[in-house]
């Protein structure tokens, strides 16, 4: 049985969306147990009772403006912190939260702990593409500054995730840069390019420009955290703007516009599905001793369900356990 600890109080739509997502997951998957951390009364108002769902009551929760390090030290009874402690103590196998990203990163590092040999765990997310296959990108903001060694490790981590969780036999790895030529980029990108080219354990396809990301040019995209986060927000914002503008044009148009939209309904639905991040799951702080997954702050029921499904796959494939073994081998070789 896979045991998943969930911060029921994190996110814009908590606890309603969180609990209703849990209800759907419990019905869909018979091999999971959920531990919900938060206000018992509020949780119970949405929960469909099940012997595979436990509520661990606490009145304390992490706020959106809490400073990460201080919150971990001072709010020891917060729902997010208690969920992470359950993982550390072996009472749960993974943690999910839609709450404060910075605090979750701190909780992941200080409570759950990083895998020996991993210098900087990276925030990894699967982003939809026009091909429908998506790509994994990291770092998406766990670290504002990185070295070439960090980015090289992200390529290894991303490839490992793509192989074991998404089932891609030989993931193509691209380096996000301001041009495709190998001479392009700042010193960080140039040094990273050399390391990736020299590593024959990964399938490096070279530099990738931001405009190529959505076409599925690579299965894994590597970036420093600052740039990666900015690109992710741009993709999300563009997708939301496109769908919003289409809706506005259709609603404000005449009868011909509405008839045309009706005829294109299935195509527009497929387009929306392609741009919809909610079905892709959450962002994994990959490189820790257990799955620590950040669901989007505005997650709805579908997004929470998808994140639970994602974590279930991670536990089913034992991707973290395999990663621990992989880095243990590398550490022995380097020693």
Curated annotation (Swiss-Prot):
Enzymatic class: transferase
GO MF annotations in UniProt: phosphate:acyl-[acyl carrier protein] acyltransferase activity
Biological process annotations from GO: fatty acid biosynthetic process; phospholipid biosynthetic process
EC numbers on record: 2.3.1.274
Pathway: Lipid metabolism; phospholipid metabolism
Catalytic reaction annotation: a fatty acyl-[ACP] + phosphate = an acyl phosphate + holo-[ACP]
SUPFAM superfamilies, sorted: Isocitrate/Isopropylmalate dehydrogenase-like (SSF53659)
InterPro entries: FA_synthesis (IPR003664), Phospholipid_synth_PlsX-like (IPR012281)
Compartment(s) where it occurs, according to its Swiss-Prot or TrEMBL record: Cytoplasm
Primary location: cytoplasm
UniProt entry keywords in alphabetical sequence: Cytoplasm, Lipid biosynthesis, Lipid metabolism, Phospholipid biosynthesis, Phospholipid metabolism, Transferase
Cited PANTHER family: FATTY ACID/PHOSPHOLIPID SYNTHESIS PROTEIN PLSX, PHOSPHATE ACYLTRANSFERASE
Family: Belongs to the PlsX family.
Purpose of the protein: Catalyzes the reversible formation of acyl-phosphate (acyl-PO(4)) from acyl-[acyl-carrier-protein] (acyl-ACP). This enzyme utilizes acyl-ACP as fatty acyl donor, but not acyl-CoA.
Protein name, per record: Phosphate acyltransferase
Organism the protein comes from: Streptococcus pyogenes serotype M18 (strain MGAS8232)
């Amino acid at each position: 049985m896979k045991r998943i600890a969930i911060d029921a109080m994190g996110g814009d739509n908590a606890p309603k969306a969180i609990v209703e997502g849990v209800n759907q997951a419990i019905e869909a998957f018979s091999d999971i147990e959920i531990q919900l951390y938060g206000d018992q009364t509020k949780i119970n108002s949405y929960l469909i009772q099940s012997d595979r769902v436990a509520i661990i009551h606490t009145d304390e929760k992490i706020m959106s403006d809490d400073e990460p390090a201080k919150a971990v030290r001072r709010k020891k009874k917060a729902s997010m912190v208690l969920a992470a402690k359950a993982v550390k103590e072996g009472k749960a196998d993974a943690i999910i939260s839609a709450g404060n990203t910075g605090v979750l990163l701190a909780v992941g590092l200080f409570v759950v702990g990083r895998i020996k040999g991993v210098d900087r765990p990276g925030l990894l997310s699967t982003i939809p593409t026009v091909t429908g296959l998506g790509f994994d990108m990291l770092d998406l903001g766990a670290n504002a500054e990185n070295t070439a060694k960090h980015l090289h490790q992200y390529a290894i981590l991303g490839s490992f995730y793509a192989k074991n969780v998404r089932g891609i036999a030989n993931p193509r790895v691209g380096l996000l840069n301001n041009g495709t030529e190998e001479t392009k980029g700042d010193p960080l990108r140039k040094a990273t390019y050399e390391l990736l080219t020299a590593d024959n354990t990964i399938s490096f396809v070279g530099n990738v420009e931001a405009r190529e990301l959505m076409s599925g040019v690579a299965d894994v995209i590597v970036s420093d955290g600052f740039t990666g986060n900015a690109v992710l927000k741009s993709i999300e914002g563009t997708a939301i703007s496109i769908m919003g503008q289409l809706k506005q044009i259709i609603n404000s148009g005449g009868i011909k516009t509405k008839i045309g939209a009706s005829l294109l309904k299935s195509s527009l639905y497929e387009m929306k599905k392609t741009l919809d991040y909610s079905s892709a799951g959450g962002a994994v702080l990959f490189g820790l001793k257990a799955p620590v997954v950040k669901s989007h702050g505005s997650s709805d029921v579908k997004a929470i369900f998808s994140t639970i499904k994602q974590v279930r796959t991670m536990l089913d494939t034992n991707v973290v356990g395999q990663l621990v073994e992989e880095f243990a081998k590398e550490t022995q070789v380097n020693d």
